[in-house]
Amino acid sequence: AEDSVLFIRTWGAHWLIGTTDTPWDQGLDHPAASASDIEYLLRNVNRVLNVELGVEDIDGVYAGLRPLIKGKKGATSDLSREHAVENTVPGFTTIAGGKYTTYRVMAEDAVNAAIADLQGRGLIGTVPKSNTENIPLIGAIGLAEAQNQLQANAKNFGVRPQEVDHLLKRYGSMVGELMSILKYRPELVTPIAGQGAGGAGYLRVEALYAVTHEGALHIDDIVTRRTHLSIETSDQGLEAAEEVAQIMGAELGWDGQRIKRELTHYQDRVAAERDAHTAVDDSGAMLARNRVPDIRLTRV
């Protein structure tokens, strides 16, 4: 909507620009940005830039949906981003709305509501107050120590200074787990292919770590989820996918045919997303994107 908030934020070597904040009445599995969405953002961002941006300057595009609590009337940009919790029926607590950045208070409110429901029906006694606001994020405990150790030992692993910063930002104190892998797989210290000189600097060891520690099972899981290679590279991660497939295949026991199927699926996905970005409206974008269902829904 024209009255939506425009964000321009640095994102590593890129800018992150959004949002459109428009209603969506298509499927929920893979919301896709249309040419109209892209044109809208370019038109508005160029109002405040000295040098105009064009489609050719875009490396990646992605779309997502906000679970807004619907009002009786008004534009989506006017609707609240807050969440609401209700005990809709005995034993069933519902949470609606909200956003990623408030996930902890959302969870606390939902659990508190469920506890209140159970206590009100005499099913449980006193429950300690939630401590979630005091619990550090994963990788936060021991961060300073991990930073000192990595900086002191980086040369021993072949990790360059800029990669030290990259790994610490992504993994925090968990970075030691990646260093443990590099002890016996030193060849994985090199960057994943296709990132270019100004790329984010994802290392090959991160692809293996995504499989061994983060549950990655398909190329999509790494190129679009565990990393942002799909939106941070000019080819949407196609070159990176080739290398990721080899690393994953060696760890997961894929044969040549399985690697080929995984790569073909990712290549088809990128082609579908590119077509979606040239569609004039939401329905056309969804029609293009839905040509390639999620790989978990297909036989591999």
What are these regions (language model features)?
Residues 1, 10-14, 20-300:
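C-terminal accessory subdomains/tails of enzymes that are appended
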Residues 6:
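Dinucleotide-binding Rossmann-like beta1-alpha1 core, especially the glycine-rich loop
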